[in-house]
Design a protein with these regions (language model features):
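A short, internal acetyl-CoA/4′-phosphopantetheine-binding micro-motif in the GNAT/acyltransferase core
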Residues: 72-88
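Active-site rim helix/loop that mediates acceptor-substrate recognition in acyltransferases
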Residues: 28-47
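Conserved acyl-CoA
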Residues: 88-102, 111, 120
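Conserved beta-strand-loop-alpha-helix junction that forms the acyl-donor binding cleft
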Residues: 103-118, 123, 129-133
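C-terminal "cap" of GNAT-fold acetyltransferases
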Residues: 130-145
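Short amphipathic alpha-helix that is part of the acyltransferase structural core
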Residues: 1-34
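A conserved beta-strand-loop-helix scaffold within acyl/acetyltransferase catalytic domains
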Residues: 63-69
Length: 145
């Protein structure tokens, strides 16, 4: 696919979980009530998942798609070191997906992911309270034509 996109591994999950962006950590723990490492390992085993590298070899994040088109992504601060490379590779990953519909929800406070989702061509559908803390989440989707 790309020299920066690789099949996800448990080792990559450990590296991402240990250096998540603060907003991603907060979304997983406060928004979903999950442990980030556990969520990433589940993602490795239960979805078609990858990890993203940037030119200096750092892992910038992991992403995957579950059956039914539920897409997810968690990132590290390495996305800020090579923002154009990361955004281009994320777009390459999303554009290569064959699902007719990609969808999920995002914590309204996670401005970095909302900006990235917009860049990747996702549309925002509705806002609603979600999770153990009833935080504001936004449903998003992308329909392939």
């Amino acid at each position: 696919m790309s020299k920066y996109i690789h099949p996800a591994t448990v080792e990559a999950a450990l590296r991402v979980a240990s250096s998540l962006l603060p907003d991603d950590y907060r979304e997983v723990t406060e928004g979903h009530g999950h442990d980030p490492l556990n969520a990433l390992i589940v993602g490795v085993h239960n979805s078609d998942s990858v990890y993203f590298e940037v030119p200096n070899g750092e892992i910038a994040g992991m992403a995957g798609v579950h059956n039914g088109g539920q897409i997810w992504m968690l990132c590290t601060p390495a996305i800020y070191e090579y923002p154009h490379t990361f955004a281009r590779e994320a777009k390459r990953y999303v554009n290569a997906r064959t699902e007719k519909l990609l969808w999920n929800i995002v914590d309204k406070r996670n401005k970095v992911h909302i900006k990235l989702l917009r860049f990747l061509g996702f549309k925002f559908l509705r806002e609603f309270p979600y999770g153990p803390n009833n935080l504001s989440f936004i449903e998003f989707c992308r329909v392939q034509s």
